């Protein structure tokens, strides 16, 4: 018996040794945010040697750190029992699952992470470094500032507290308001102007914005858009514009893909081409001032380690707002409490505003917090697929009635929705509208996700829509018939739709449920028209600039749609050039 057992044990040991005698590669599949993630994993003696990403449909910017840094960590730790990448949770889980699936197929059991190996894999950074310009925040404003500073001859570094770049600039629709843009003449729009754009912005913010700053934004918008198109290579739709609420003209350029991915991928490529270091996971903690009161650097932390970035010319703040910080939102506007979700990126939490305040900057208009009216009731994210609203989609309450002009200001729409039964609405459009907006085609992953969630459907007729939404059919049909009877500009007797209603008599139809969600914080650092940070008494803080949502004087009480990208490009460029000049 013992002899037999010995033979069996020897055979087992031989088989086990043979199993790991040579490297083996197996494929595995996991589910990410936007579909399957397929990998090929090479094992040698039971340890991961290499991971190749074979297939995925994830956002290339958000997923970049997952498929680089996290992938390398898995190899170094020989484990999937690691923290995922913040802001890319579902993609991280999908990669973990795919690697585990491959391991199972290879007969390999992955255990706890090898922390020593993981620590050794972390790249060392100098604890004290000097640059001409330090830019904090790697969104649209930060990249614009860093690129312009570099092109002005400055040695520049871009710091980002999150594992990936982009922030709200990445996940937004990224439309950009530009008066007298190159698409307007194709649509017969010949009477727009920077002055009219400025007037719309000022009135849209209830006359609380700084008109000097607004005029700089609108008068530099075209140059900014041409810089994006011609220098960065950003592609815009050639023959279509968005008509956002509160504007008197259709003027918003639309990036290819209808999201900020087009911008951020091109920003990243240009930063790489220019050799601009982009350091992620680096959180700014405190601005450094010299004895004369000039900002000359920033103290930051990464994984508990302190770093100092000295800035000869100065620092540019481009960190966005605080819409993803519920406590801060409620502090400044108690009406927007825990019931509200947010459209914002996870890193939009506002700590840098207090950092700027400690350095002497005045914070203004902090109580003005915008909600976006058309968002996912479950997650709070913007329903970009419902941007068909800008081309004629209508908003209905549970009773099947229109209740507001669909192109009204965001705050007006949000309040109107909250006044309806259940505090939600339905957005309805047909193929005629869809042929112009192309939102279903441009956002297929949204369509799949919202359909699976049960908040969206496609129907051949209104009876099907009524069954799905539980709206009384007679009421629904009556509203659609009335809309059709008033099709055309100037014919809306009910709510005076500024662009004109569209014939909705024929399907097929699309409908989605929507609620308001926290979207943009108008308050922030007080700046002047040169993007310089100011004290409460209006004095310039030497060496400190700010651009984008971190500032608080451009949009007044309410930001008009499409103005965020105009803001970040224009003032990011101004701030970067000025900081570089100050270093000379």
Task: Report the location of each language-model feature.
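Beta1/beta-strand and adjacent pyrophosphate-binding region of the FAD-binding site
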Residues: 122-141, 157
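Conserved N-terminal/central alpha/beta ligand/cofactor-binding core
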Residues: 164-277, 281-286, 395-403, 407-408, ...
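Helical element adjacent to the flavin cofactor pocket in flavoenzyme catalytic cores
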Residues: 255-313, 353, 357-359
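A glycine-rich dinucleotide-binding beta-alpha-beta segment and adjacent secondary-structure elements
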Residues: 286, 475-558
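Glycine-rich loop(s) and the adjacent beta-strand/alpha-helix scaffold that form part
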Residues: 303-305, 310-376, 382, 571-574
């Amino acid at each position: 018996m013992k002899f037999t057992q010995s033979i069996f044990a020897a055979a087992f040991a031989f088989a086990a040794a043979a199993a790991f005698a040579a490297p083996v590669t197996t494929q595995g599949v996991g589910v990410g945010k936007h579909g399957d993630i397929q990998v090929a994993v090479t094992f040698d003696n039971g340890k991961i040697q290499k991971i190749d990403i074979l297939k995925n449909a994830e956002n290339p910017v958000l997923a970049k750190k997952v498929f680089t840094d996290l992938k390398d960590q898995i190899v170094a730790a020989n484990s999937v029992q690691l923290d995922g990448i913040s802001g890319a949770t579902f993609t991280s889980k999908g990669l973990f699952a795919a690697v585990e699936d491959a391991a199972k197929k290879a007969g390999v059991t992955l255990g706890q992470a090898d922390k020593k190996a993981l620590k050794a894999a972390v790249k060392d950074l100098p604890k004290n470094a000097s640059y001409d310009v330090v830019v904090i925040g790697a969104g649209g404003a930060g990249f614009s500032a860093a690129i312009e500073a570099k092109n002005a001859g400055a040695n520049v570094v871009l710091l980002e507290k999150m594992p990936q770049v982009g922030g709200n600039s990445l996940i937004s629709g990224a439309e950009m308001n530009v008066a007298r843009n190159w698409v307007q003449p194709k649509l017969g729009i010949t009477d727009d102007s920077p002055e009219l754009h400025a007037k719309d912005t000022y009135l849209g913010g209830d006359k609380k914005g700084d008109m000097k700053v607004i005029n700089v934004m609108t008068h530099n918008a075209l140059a900014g858009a041409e810089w994006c198109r011609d220098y960065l290579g950003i592609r815009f739709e050639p023959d279509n514009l968005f008509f956002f609420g509160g504007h008197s003209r259709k003027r918003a350029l639309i990036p290819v893909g209808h999201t900020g991915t087009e911008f951020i991928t091109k920003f990243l490529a240009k930063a790489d081409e220019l050799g601009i270091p982009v350091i992620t996971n680096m959180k700014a903690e405190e601005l450094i001032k010299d004895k004369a009161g000039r900002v000359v650097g920033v103290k930051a932390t990464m994984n508990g380690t302190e770093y100092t970035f000295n800035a000869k010319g100065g620092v540019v703040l481009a960190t966005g707002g605080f819409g993803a910080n519920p406590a801060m939102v409620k502090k400044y506007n108690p009406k927007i409490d825990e019931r509200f979700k947010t459209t914002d990126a996870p890193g939009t939490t506002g700590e840098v505003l207090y950092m700027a305040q400690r350095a002497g900057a005045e914070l203004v208009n902090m109580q003005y917090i915008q909600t976006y009216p058309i968002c996912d009731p479950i997650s709070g994210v913007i329903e970009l697929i419902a941007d068909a609203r800008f081309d004629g989609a209508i908003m209905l309450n549970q009773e099947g009635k229109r209740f507001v002009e669909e192109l009204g200001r965001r705050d007006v729409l949000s309040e109107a929705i909250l006044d309806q039964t259940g505090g939600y609405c339905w957005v309805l459009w047909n193929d005629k509208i869809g042929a112009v907006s192309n939102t279903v085609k441009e956002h297929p992953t949204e369509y799949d996700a919202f359909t699976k969630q049960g908040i969206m459907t496609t129907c051949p007729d209104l009876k099907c829509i009524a069954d799905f939404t539980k709206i009384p059919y007679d009421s629904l049909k009556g509203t659609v018939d009335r809309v059709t009877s008033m099709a055309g500009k100037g014919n809306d007797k009910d709510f005076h739709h500024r662009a004109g209603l569209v014939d909705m008599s024929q399907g097929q139809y699309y409908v989605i449920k929507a609620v308001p969600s926290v979207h943009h914080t108008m308050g922030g650092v007080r700046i002047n028209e040169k993007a310089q940070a100011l004290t409460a008494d209006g004095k310039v803080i030497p060496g400190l600039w700010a651009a984008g949502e971190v500032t608080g004087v451009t949009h007044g009480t309410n930001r008009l749609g499409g103005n965020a990208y105009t803001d970040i490009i224009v003032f990011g460029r101004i701030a970067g050039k000025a900081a570089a000049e100050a270093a000379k």
